[in-house]
Amino acid sequence: MSLLSGDQRIICLEIPLQGKENVHINFAKEVEKLYGPSVQENSKKNDLSDSADSEGESTHVDEQQAANGAADGTQTIKKKKRKRRYADEYYDRTDPFIDDAELYIEEKAAATKDGFFVFSGPLVAEGDTVKIERSKKTKKKKKTSLSNATHPAPAVSAVVASADASFDDSRDIESEDEQPLRTLSIEMAAKNALKEAKRENAKVPKDVSKKEAKTTKSKEKATKKTSSSVPKQSTGENTKKAVKLETPLTSTPPIPPLSEPKHSPATVNEHISPPSALTNPSTEELKPSTSLPIDQGNASVVSKPTQQVSIVLSQNASLPVDEHQAEPEKSIPTSSIP
């Protein structure tokens, strides 16, 4: 019996009938007996049958190959090479869904227009940047978290209490995978509430500080007005207060001055020498009957009822003279003073 399997190859099988009318023949087994299992493997690759049938046949063939290899002493099993998947390494750049803007940024020009060679990317001048056109579909939108809407918090204390309560409830109700998201949303709500509270508190001291500044300015103005209205003391009075005459040390102890009768300024001119005679320290003897108005701070007076009176003056001392009195006359003779 001969069968034609196309023009390329002819397979010949000899099957004895032995006087039988109905004979059942397994063509695959007969081919395996003559050509071996390799012929059947090639036929399976070209076969378009179901995957279930192919898996069942492959297991049967593997068992036959192991049996034939053990009988012949040679192993014909070969390991299949793993195919390389190019889809993992490359992608379709024309696909608008893929956002590949970062790749274009890396391909920026490495030189300027002044005769340099550009390795890759567009030609760009110094200081300029590459403008990449992005499709509208690839724009990323920020997702608004529902935590701010579900947990409004006007005050800080209320937010902390609600956050603790919700966190305790989430441990019992939610699963372990959803707990981190829950805690993050609570923390964000607490942070937003703290920021709002700080802004409100910052507004109050500003208003208070402005009012305080106004009050201080008004007080300063009032003090300036009052100080300008008070009359200043004359310099003459200050100098009179500052001037103090020092009394030199003497051998005799000081005696408190006796009460003397007041005399008119005319008596002073009769018994006092001109100012030129009193510049140097000197002692002058006066009669007991004469009396002078002497300042207690400028001189020390030693008086006795029956003896003469000695007056000790310092170098810069001056006798008190009435301001309304006229200057002493220079024509007074010195012989009048003993």
Curated annotation (Swiss-Prot):
Pfam family, one: HUN
Biased composition, class Polar residues, residue ranges: 276-301
Name recorded for this polypeptide: Histone promoter control protein 2
Any single biological process term in GO: chromatin organization
Cellular component GO terms held in the UniProt record: chromatin; HIR complex; nucleus
Chief location of this protein within or outside the cell: nucleus
Phosphoserine modified-residue sites: S175
Biased composition (Basic and acidic residues): 193-223, 321-330
Function of the molecule: Component of the HIR complex, which functions as a histone chaperone that cooperates with cia1/asf1 to promote replication-independent chromatin assembly.
Compositional bias of kind Low complexity: 152-165
InterPro entries, per the entry: HRD
Quaternary assembly: Component of the HIR complex.
Subcellular localization: Nucleus
Keyword Transmembrane helix in annotation: no
Keyword Nucleus on entry: yes
Keywords: Chromatin regulator, Nucleus, Phosphoprotein, Transcription, Transcription regulation
Family, similarity comment: Belongs to the HPC2 family.
Source domain of life: Eukaryota
